[in-house]
Design a protein with these regions (language model features):
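Catalytic domains of riboflavin
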Residues: 1-152
Length: 152
C-alpha cells in the first residue's frame, strides 16, 4: 500500500539517554500515526544512524518476555545518543502489522503451541503484514540523504 504522508508536529522529547526531537506524521491512506525520533544534524552528507522500529506495546510498555522489542528500541536510542546523531523511525505496526487485539489472539495460539508465523496464519494473516514505504517519505521529509541502518 502506497503511503500519503502528512506532517503533524515537531517537539522536544527528553529521555533517559538524552534529548531527542520527535516528528509526528500520519499516513492518510490508513490513518496510522508514525514518529521520527531524531537527534543531531540530520542534513549533512554523512550517513545518518537509523533504525526502523515497529511499535510493540506489550514489550515496550508492559515488559513482555515474548520479544526483545523494548531492548532493541532502548539500544537504538542509546547508540544514537552516544553518537549524538541519528533517527528512529517508529511505526504503528503492532504485532507484525496485525494490530494489538490480533496480537493478543496470536499470543493465545502461541500459548497452545503455535509459533508466531503459524499463529498469524491461523488468524488469516501473512507471516508479516508490515509495510515500510512510509519510511522513505519520512526520510525525504527530513532531508536525510543516506542512512546507516541498524538491524536486530
Amino acid at each position: 500500500m502506497e503511503s500519503k504522508l502528512k506532517f503533524i508536529e515537531t517537539s522536544k522529547l527528553p529521555t533517559d539517554v538524552g534529548e531527542f526531537t520527535v516528528h509526528a506524521f500520519t499516513d492518510e491512506k490508513d490513518s496510522k500515526d508514525h514518529l521520527a525520533i531524531g537527534m543531531g544534524d540530520l542534513l549533512t552528507n554523512e550517513p545518518v544512524l537509523s533504525r526502523i522500529h515497529s511499535q510493540c506495546i506489550t514489550g515496550e510498555s508492559f515488559f513482555s518476555m515474548r520479544c526483545d522489542c523494548r531492548y532493541q528500541l532502548t539500544e537504538s536510542l542509546t547508540q544514537i545518543a552516544e553518537k549524538g546523531r541519528g533517527v528512529v523511525f517508529y511505526l504503528q505496526q503492532e504485532g507484525r502489522g496485525i494490530g494489538l487485539s490480533n496480537k493478543i489472539r496470536a499470543y493465545n495460539l502461541q500459548d497452545k503451541g503455535f509459533d508466531t508465523v503459524e499463529a498469524n496464519h491461523q488468524l488469516g494473516f501473512k507471516e508479516d503484514e508490515r509495510g515500510y514505504g512510509i519510511v522513505s517519505d519520512m526520510i525525504n521529509f527530513l532531508g536525510i540523504k543516506t542512512v546507516d541502518l541498524m538491524t536486530n
